């Protein structure tokens, strides 16, 4: 009884934290991809910014967050190449976001190729330079202010 109650307490307590990493190969589409590197720099895990993530949804639509604003747009996949277009974002002022939002948008703008290896999604530009790395996560942050 006590161990069962403890298990539920830990489960409920852990649901309030940011995305948890999932193991095993993940599909490119429909997976919550949490940004861990943008333009060669690690994405900091700070409480003051929203989680930076990307979801490639059905019918070529995408949504996510650049660390400050919600983003949405379109994507096209063809033989390992990727093209992001019709990008739109909210226009909130985020003092603590630094340049993460700019790095996220630039990574999507310059991406030409995509690979998925296990739990990682990587975007590469036309010079085959890696511009972003994302990690598959089971869900987004339970805190709406962080989404």
Predicted regions and their residues:
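Lipid interaction determinants
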Residues: 2-8, 12-147
């Amino acid at each position: 009884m006590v161990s069962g109650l403890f298990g539920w307490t830990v489960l409920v307590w852990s649901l309030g934290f940011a995305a948890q990493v999932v193991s095993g190969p993940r599909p490119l589409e429909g997976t919550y991809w949490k940004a861990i590197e943008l333009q060669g720099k690690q994405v900091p895990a700070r409480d003051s910014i929203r989680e930076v993530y990307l979801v490639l949804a059905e019918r070529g639509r995408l949504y996510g967050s650049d660390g400050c604003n919600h983003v949405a747009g379109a994507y096209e996949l063809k033989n390992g190449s990727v093209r992001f277009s019709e990008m739109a974002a909210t226009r909130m002022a985020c003092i603590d976001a630094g340049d993460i939002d700019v790095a996220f948008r630039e990574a999507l703008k310059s991406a030409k190729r995509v690979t998925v290896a296990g739990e990682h999604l990587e975007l590469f530009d036309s010079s085959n330079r890696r511009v972003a790395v994302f990690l598959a996560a089971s869900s987004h942050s339970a805190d709406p202010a962080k989404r």
